[in-house]
Amino acid sequence: MYDTSLAKDEFRKWSRSYDKSILQLLLFGPSHRAIIRRLQARFGDSPFNVLDIGCGTGVFAERIRARFPNAEVWGIDLVAAMLDKGRERFQAHDGRIIPIQGDSERLPFANAGFDVVTCCNSFHHYPDQGRAVDEMRRVLAPGGELMLIDGYRDGLWGRLIYDVCVAGVEGEVHHCSARRFRDLFHASGLIELSQKVHRGFAPCLLNRATAPAIIPMPHIAAGVESGHRVMAKSEHRQRN
């Protein structure tokens, strides 16, 4: 069974070659550009803050900062080795990229703190995907947007790429169908769901949804009742 310890071990090994992986060209780069186009359409040159879940070595965080100099980018990753590899990249942005080690299923942030939450090509590694979406939903500000892109496994080519090739290398990871994404988003209370397929050598599905203006009480309490270490962004700055 694929679990957090297996994910940690896999990415610890991958951290040594992650920035030079062919996937940066074939998969990650196109995914990053798709989300940046959406950020541009939504914010233009206005300031915003974003949490990138599964940030790895910070390649995407740096691309966001390059395009949106007024943005504040927070990155969280399960694996310290990934963050260590990106240390110089993070430090080059004068505190406007803030990396934190943590778990997508227990985000160490207060409720409703981010304008945007992004997740690029890491969701299939999350053992409890429903809980991860609930956490993404919890930390979004009312009206904030979740942008989650991952492998598109619907159709013959998608199943071959993700259910056979990727699963053969990475083990028991799970790429969601478009319907499964819709079910997860709706169950978490997200609204205004839209989905767009991005074709290419490795097709991806960009899922977008919005946090409603009123946060249901169960979601407000989730961070504390689940035993999360909830940390407000201002508290982090005071400590550092």
Where are these regions (language model features)?
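A short SAM/SAH-binding and catalytic strip from SAM-dependent methyltransferases
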Residues: 116-128
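Core SAM-dependent methyltransferase catalytic element
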Residues: 190, 194-233
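A short acidic, Gly/Pro-enriched loop at the edge of an enzyme's catalytic core
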Residues: 105-116
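C-terminal alpha-helical "lid/dimerization" subdomain adjacent to the S-adenosyl-L-methionine
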Residues: 2-5, 22-24, 147-207
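A short glycine-rich, Lys/Arg-flanked "PGG" loop and its adjoining helix->strand segment in the class I
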Residues: 130-142
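Conserved class I S-adenosyl-L-methionine
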Residues: 1-44, 59-63
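A generic alpha-to-beta junction signature in SAM-dependent methyltransferases
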Residues: 43-44, 67, 140
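Class I SAM-dependent methyltransferase SAM/SAH-binding core
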Residues: 51-53, 57-106
